[in-house]
Amino acid sequence: FPKLALFCSQVPWDTQIQNLDYNKWLISTLKEIKKYSNRKIIFRKHPLHTPRPGFKYFDKEFLKKNNIYAEISTNNLKDDLKNCYCVVAYNSTVLVDSILEGIPIISGSNTSIIYDLSTKKISDIENLTRFTNLEIKKVLSNISYKQWSIEEFKKGEPFKFFFK
């Protein structure tokens, strides 16, 4: 089987996507994937995405209404990643999971914590940027330096670290 393109959506009320028309970005990105690739697209809704007043619900009807031909996943993430060629998302942390599984990513935003390991343009979907283990380790190490416990915050350690 040819490998799949996995598109992972975010909940439309996520604060990370309030600076753009996420529905428009989602639709145009899915159409752009089809423009540059013949791969089957698997659409993965955020696991917490449920119908909510004032927000679009990303279901089969939503995709069909917008002329998007993608299969909606009902699998867990680990299963979705098994036959994956790449993962596309705006700035979801699922992109970190993908990198950890050795799967290339395309991030739609430079606000993604893993953007430095991302192919930047959908038009490059069939020519993805591949990173060395050393490059991946460096970025993941930088991310880990930004993780702090409540106790460390109480002691002011993050502030000492960043503002020394």
Where are these regions (language model features)?
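A nucleotide-sugar donor-handling region in carbohydrate enzymes
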Residues: 1-19
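Leloir-type glycosyltransferase catalytic cores
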Residues: 1-2, 115-164
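Structural motif
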Residues: 4, 40, 85-86
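Short, solvent-exposed loop/turn segments at secondary-structure junctions
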Residues: 10-14, 47-50, 93-95, 111-114
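Short, solvent-exposed loop/turn segments at secondary-structure boundaries
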Residues: 17-21, 54-55
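Catalytic donor nucleotide-activated moiety binding site of glycosyltransferases and closely related
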Residues: 30-73
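A donor-sugar binding/catalytic signature common to diverse glycosyltransferases
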Residues: 74-119
